[in-house]
Amino acid sequence: MQPLNISDNDDDQETLSFLPEAPMVHIRVPKRKQKKRCCGCRRWVIQSFLFLFTLSAVLAAKFYIITTSAAARGETEKTVTKWRDLHLNDIGHWCLQPNVTTCKCANPLQPSHRHGHKTWTEAHLENLKLAKNILPKKSPFRELDVVFMGDSITEGWRGTSFGVKVDKKQANVEVFESLFDMDKGGEFDGLVLGIAGDKSQNLLWRIQNGEIPKKLKSKVFWLLIGTNDFLKPGFDQCSEEVVFMGIQRIIEEMMTLRPSTTIVVNGLLPRSDVGAKGELYKENEKTVMDAIDNVNSQLEEYCNLHDDLEYFDPSGIFIEVDSKLGGARYAKYIPEKLMGDRLHPTALGYRRWGEKIVEELRKILDGKLTIERL
């Protein structure tokens, strides 16, 4: 805003001219009152400028968070910047396979509604109800310990897909309640906000459209998203650079909405698209598991740069070794008992995973639990 322009003709008096039919008359009018009015204008302009400057600074600060751009990954010091400093130009290669140059990857920074997917919309509306109307069961002062956010793997805790009950997943519900429902004997209270098939852009849209409302209070938010960002084998899969940037964008959105709240970033669960036994790696060929390892390594490094982020490594939960499959890394595989389709956990897989989550929550919440837990 420019300061008020004061006339250069600022002498002690000014001339007002009247032009009736009679001869022209010149009247000398003192300017003292006009000067006082201009001084008042100056004060008003200065005050307005200071107000707008302060307001702009406050609004700008709201969108500044601690982060690091893709180009700056690997630095040991925190960098103050904006999420807008994430640039698509930082992505060196969009496709998973190095020899593939064309793949249909969505913009990892752009929130996206799954238009035309009626059941997805209904599932989102159901999540809004859960997020806004979650009520403590024992005490009006008790807040949630953990809120799980993600895709079908997260939604599986509820035994549903797109909010619809799935019979073969009901054993998962029993596992969840035994660990994350204090009324059912669980050590902590948890809430699940996941939707099957979601990519990072879909979860970002959900978060920006009400799934983390102000009234939703939780000591910890637990994030698992990104495996669907790779796309399915044979569909020109997207690279780990694309996947990591999408997850990073969500993390920064959550840090903005919940500053000083602990956010646990769950590493991507292992998945197999190599062999019938659930093998993870293949000689002379880049697999999705290779990309998952790269994404998880970057997520861990990113979390180490932020005080309110914790990285959770899931690799040891679902992976076993069979020397008959090969040596070293080629002996690793996902047993069917833990992941029937080598992507989604079985009830046993959820049990093992959930018990490790409980251990992590104990570490995070140690000393923070109050009388409300009694």
Language-model features: locations:
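Conserved SGNH/GDSL esterase-like catalytic core that processes O-acyl groups on lipids
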Residues: 102-252, 256, 272, 277, ...
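N-terminal secretory targeting modules
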Residues: 3-149, 153-174, 364-374
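Alpha/beta-hydrolase-fold catalytic nucleophile elbow
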Residues: 224, 264-267
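Catalytic His-Asp segment of secreted/periplasmic serine-dependent ester chemistry enzymes
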Residues: 270-374
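A structural motif corresponding to the C-terminal end of an alpha-helix
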Residues: 185-187, 253-263, 298-312
